Amino acid sequence: MKQEYEVLFTPWKIGNLEIKNRIVMCSMGGTSIFGWMKPNHFDKEAANFLLERAKNNVGLILPGIAPIRDTMGGKWLYQNKGKFKELKEFMDEFHKTGAKMFIQLTAGMGRSMAVNDLMVKMIKNKAFGTIAKPIFDMDYICASASATPNRWADDIYSRPLTVVEIHQIVEAFAKTAKLCMDAGVDGIEVHAVHEGYTLDQFTMKYTNQRTDEYGGSFENRYRFPVEIVTAIKKTCGDDFPVSLRYSVTSKTKGFRQGAVPGEDDFIEVGRDMEESEKAAKFLQDAGYDMLNCDNGTYDSWYWAHPPAYMPENCNLSDVSHIKNFVTIPVVCAGKMTPSVGAKAIKEEKLDAMGVARQFLADPTWVTKLMEDHEADIKPCIHCHNACFNMARYEGTANIQDLTDAIHMARCAINPCTMQSKKYKISKAAKVKNIAVIGGGFGGMESALVLSQRGHNVTIYEKTDRLCGIFNEAAAPIYKEKDRELMEWYKREISKYPITIKFNTEIKDIHTLQADEIIIATGSTAKHPPIKGIEYSIEATEYLSGKEVGDNVIIVGGGLTGCEIAYDLILKGKKPQIVEMKNDLIAVKGVCLANSSFLREMLAFKKTPIYLETMLLEIKEDGVVVKDKEGKTFDLKGDSVIVSIGYKPTPLVKASRHVHLVGDANEVGNLRTVIWRAWDVCMKL
């Protein structure tokens, strides 16, 4: 391995427990070994997921959160002894890898619970809620420190947990931790004084207006997590390590309002650095053996789950600062890179590096790092298209697919993640000659799957390069991981006997001598029938490098339009956005961490945004628009970029031996492109 990475593979201790290296796989929703949104079962898919990562040289593994009280059914976790019997059998196998595992137990979500439309009905309709209560007790699930508004639904409020309920939760943590310890689990992580979950809601003034022993003073607000670690230590002994998931600062300006990077002049309503310095020491003295750190709350979700737009290692400076106030180990997560993580550990600014979603994209990345095959690591691109499908548009949380609520920890670019039964390579019964028309991501993924199954594959690409429209999509300054993924695909393609014919446009599929044909010809931009359209350029033209002036009007406030606006800001230009809908990025399926960052960054940069506004005409020096009141006015600009979406451009229709993949089938995102390729190619 590279010399700079050697420090990542040195041992360290949490209490008296030695961990073999400094790489921590952080918890991700959907990877709970006790299942997620499914009561009374040990999740074998998650167990296999965790074991594969352990076999690939991870030091410490933290499975997804396990609610101390089942979300469905309301049963206390410690009451289900069968789960812990299976857990013990798993731990015996797990420990053969040399890795260690802490189970992450959560007190709950509180106001951060992502309520969908059905859940809202359970809350608002008392009769319906009573009927549903044995399955979904929404009143309890959403209970918080005080009556506070739900993050996802404008008119839903949490009720305060009672003191009796708090004591029950504390007792449940202790009982569950003992069962975990007896099953061979190496430690517990308490979830969480972090991200605005239930325990965090108790610690912060803006979500805690209690007047009893759990509200008011600093000590009272932090009493709940202190009582939990005290109870665990009393039951399991002082040597049983307990970690705390901890957000150093909240980066929160108010309900549903975060502070973006660079926005330093704001009033923190959550935990500021001064309080955090005190809290970290207070929590250490209470008995916690490690702080697993980042920043943010659900109101500033992009800090805890940083999308592509956030800087790499975005939480490191705050987390390394807090290490000065404790003597227990400190871990930092948040787009951590091995080089920066290793440097911080060497300089004693951190004890270990926390990584999460990179393990979804490539389960073997740590092994590749050790063996000096860094170029072969498939990079996470921070898209959140499959691992975090919770979006917020038109009032409540929504998802791409109902099943996503059960298993979130999937991966747009690695369908096998947490779906090993559905997506796995199997050799074809009969080897075929297969033509793939189009060398974009849909075409390349199809070719890789088909080649691994034993087929003879030829890609026909009309240009002189692979990756299709992703060449443009990956152009913005902050899309460096997208560009890394493009290079990964090119290298991966070269490892297989796949023929590529560049500068070859297929106009008649009948000229191909192929048993099966994959149409991966992508999509083209929509063109509005607007006077003066010749004075504008398409989004893809800008992303291809076409020059624009300093003042740029963007027609279309969807995801691409907003990403272009942010790219322009980073280049020192002044964008303004015209959008017909009543909000930016008004679509389902774009993760709230992504969309809220763009909305709030554009607001911070004072970008003019014209919602519910129609484009009437494009001129040499700007556009003519009409607002929702019917008022017509001019907007001045040096350049106009039109970004109103795309439409499929299949070469031919699908038939028995002709199959559509990617945007040629239906315009979507990278997840729909990659997964569709597998769905089609595993059947050939």
What are the functions of these language-model segments?
Residues G334-M336, R357-Q358, S523, G645-Y646, ...:
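Active-site metal-binding loops of divalent metal-dependent hydrolases
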Residues I413-A428, S494, F502, T521-G572, ...:
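Glycine-rich dinucleotide-binding loop and its adjacent helix/turn
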Residues A435-T499, G557-A593, A603, P608, ...:
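Beta1-alpha1 glycine-rich phosphate/pyrophosphate-binding loop at the start
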Residues V587-C591, V661-L684:
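A conserved FAD-binding loop/helix module that cradles the flavin
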Residues K481-K526, I533-D550, L570-K653:
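A Rossmann-like FAD-binding core segment of flavoenzymes
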Residues H305-P311, K424-S426, V431, E472-E484, ...:
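Short, contiguous acidic/charged loop-to-helix segments that flank catalytic cores in large enzymes
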Residues D362-K368, Y566-I577, V673-L684:
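Internal hydrophobic alpha-helix adjacent to the cofactor/substrate pocket in enzyme cavities
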Residues M1-I437, F441, E445-Q452, V457, ...:
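Flavin-dependent oxidoreductase catalytic cores
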